[in-house]
Amino acid sequence: MAFHSLSYTESDSKIILIYGDSISAGYGMPKEQQWSEDLKELFLEENLNIGIENRSVSGETTGGGLARLGNILDQVNPHYLLIELGGNDALRGYPPKRILKNLNEMIDLAVSRNIRVFLMQIKILPNYGKRYQEQFESIYLKASEEKNVTLLPFMLDNIALEEGMMLPDGIHPNERAQPLIAQYVFDDLVPYLK
């Protein structure tokens, strides 16, 4: 009697492309401590045939992300796209309408290739002014509703204000936060992947 072990190769896996800025690029973390690596492990533990390709870039804006996306989709050929962009646009005070336009164009590009899109809500500090903060944060719901894509909660909601979870800059999560981010993202994604 022959026994066959069940193993998945990269070509068998459905690929999630993580496409974000320094938060998803694991700013200040060695690769093995980044939340995207922890997310890979969670998928393995649950025997989900999901691969992760992280093409996040520190400092990326929605405009830069839009400019790069076509080539990256050609290279990776993902089944799913998780967009975590916009924070750097807000840091530069870019108009919310421009950010929304860039997000919508990225979504359109992915959907035209039959890629399921997950859009991550981004939140910013109130020191940009309440009006700008509200306008900025509302674009994610607008984009998700206009384009009929899944809006995921901000991954730092339960982390950013927790003591001992952020780097000294107060913007980037530290090594203690990485597995928690992975678990939050995993819990938010899994219902849509089964």
Predicted regions and their residues:
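Acidic/histidine-rich helix-loop elements
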Residues: G28-P30, E53-T61, A90-Y94, D169-G170
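Bacterial N-terminal signal peptides
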Residues: M1-A2
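Serine-esterase "nucleophile elbow" of acetyl-processing enzymes
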Residues: L6-S58, R68-N77
